[in-house]
Swiss-Prot record:
Heme 1 (or BL or b562) is low-potential and absorbs at about 562 nm, and heme 2 (or BH or b566) is high-potential and absorbs at about 566 nm. The gene is MT-CYB. It holds the Pfam family Cytochrome_B. It is found in: Mitochondrion inner membrane. CDD domains: cytochrome_b_C, Cytochrome_b_N. A ubiquinone binds at H202. InterPro entries: Cyt_b/b6_C, Cyt_b/b6_C_sf, Cyt_b/b6_N, Cytb/b6-like_sf, Cytochrome_b, Cytochrome_b_C_euk/bac, Cytochrome_b_N_euk/bac, Di-haem_cyt_TM. Keywords: Electron transport, Heme, Iron, Membrane, Metal-binding, Mitochondrion, Mitochondrion inner membrane, Respiratory chain, Transmembrane, Transmembrane helix, Transport, Ubiquinone. This is Cytochrome b. It is a multi-pass membrane protein. Component of the ubiquinol-cytochrome c reductase complex (complex III or cytochrome b-c1 complex) that is part of the mitochondrial respiratory chain. The b-c1 complex mediates electron transfer from ubiquinol to cytochrome c. Contributes to the generation of a proton gradient across the mitochondrial membrane that is then used for ATP synthesis. It comes from Cepphus grylle (Black guillemot). Heme b b566 binds at H98, H197.
Length: 380
């Protein structure tokens, strides 16, 4: 009998073991769809980004008008741009839900998978930041100025580092060209990291909603989960296309319709919605270096979650106290996001400070304490 090419060919074998014959827990819910959704988001962003790059000019005098030209004169240029801009929002929605699922169901105990995932998040954040600068509107310019300036808080080497990043003494043409180069490069790095992420995941196999071993009950990935993923793609593309076609500027800042002007500062400098929680934490500390450290810690704290797991159970499915704490954390993040979009004045300052304190307290103190407490309760 002729060997099955899918199982014998060196390249097809890898695809087969990852997407076709992969043994998958039979009870994984729709929360496990977000990994594949992130993959399709990345593909969409690379495709639309490539098409946009063919019409973009990375020069301070031409960048803004080249984006306007793409929207006005290029066939479906407006649609490509709207899909790319809103696709970034959906990318972040998916990654935040993906992280939330990992946190809730204890998937972070696959340490290598979790750590590469956090590195992926950081790379995605960097990509989105440099990408936001490219249209060279007011918020692009001032966002780049404010965020890159944060590096000057690093003692001794800070100022040199910032000027090195800028390629001069302010955000200017060299900054824009290097940001374009980085924005082109980083998505391919994300794709490479995603493969590493998957390699680590397939070492141990997926977790499941019960947080228990599922070796006794696994089913092939195809056709069950391949079809489930395709359904997920359809469900995600519907709101994405609706947003891109009906209200493409809903999530953007109107300030970015004004070309960059170093002489006029916008009244409220704020990043896109998906960075607002971190921006609120940054602003809640009156000291520059302290704010930068808190900003970095707000994401880097994810590296510590596997070490802070004190419960005997993996998932939160049967841990009501941890569940309560988890949803408090989610609410807290929503409050931080809202505060980040508000001006720096009373009562937003104190709300932001309390929410920032709560964020770190829940993650670093309350979760391990409640985990240990639930262990005690199990013994009674």
């Amino acid at each position: 009998m002729a060997p099955n090419l899918r199982k014998s060919h060196p390249l097809l074998k890898i695809i087969n073991n990852s997407l076709i014959d992969l043994p998958t827990p039979s009870n994984i819910s729709a929360w496990w769809n977000f990994g594949s959704l992130l993959g399709i988001c990345l593909l969409t962003q690379i495709l639309t980004g490539l098409l946009l790059a063919t019409h973009y000019t990375a020069d301070t005098t031409l960048a803004f008008s080249s984006v306007a030209h793409t929207c006005r004169n290029v066939q479906y240029g407006w649609l490509i741009r709207n899909l790319h801009a809103n696709g970034a929002s959906f990318f972040f929605i998916c990654i935040y839900l993906h992280i939330g699922r990992g946190f809730y169901y204890g998937s972070y105990l696959n340490k290598e998978t979790w750590n590469t995932g956090v590195i992926l998040l950081l790379t995605l954040m960097a990509t989105a930041f440099v990408g936001y600068v490219l249209p060279w509107g007011q918020m692009s310019f001032w966002g780049a100025t404010v965020i890159t300036n944060l590096f000057s808080a690093i003692p001794y080497i800070g100022q040199t580092l910032v000027e090195w990043a800028w390629g001069g003494f302010s955000v200017d043409n060299p900054t824009l060209t290097r940001f374009f180069a980085l924005h082109f490069l980083l998505p391919f790095m994300i794709a490479g990291l995603a493969l590493i992420h998957l390699t680590f995941l397939h070492e141990s196999g997926s977790n499941n909603p019960l947080g228990i071993l599922s070796n006794c009950d696994k089913i092939p990935f195809h056709p069950y989960f391949s079809l489930k993923d395709i359904l997920g793609f359809i469900i995600m593309f519907l709101p994405l296309t609706t947003l891109a076609l009906f209200s493409p500027n809903l999530l953007g800042d109107p300030e970015n319709f004004t070309p960059a002007n170093p002489l006029i500062t916008p009244p409220h400098i704020k990043p896109e919605w998906y960075f607002l929680f971190a921006y609120a934490i940054l602003r809640s500390i009156p000291n520059k270096l302290g704010g930068v450290l808190a900003l970095a810690a707000s994401v880097l704290v994810l590296f510590l979650t596997p070490l802070l797991h004190k419960s005997k159970q993996r998932a939160m499915t049967f841990r009501p106290l941890s569940q309560l704490l988890f949803w408090t954390l989610v609410t807290n993040l929503c409050i931080l996001t809202w505060v980040g979009s508000q001006p720096v004045e009373h009562p937003f300052i104190i709300i932001g400070q309390l929410a920032s304190l709560t964020y770190f307290t829940i993650l670093l103190l309350l979760f391990p304490i409640i985990g240990a407490l639930e262990n005690k309760m199990l013994n009674y």
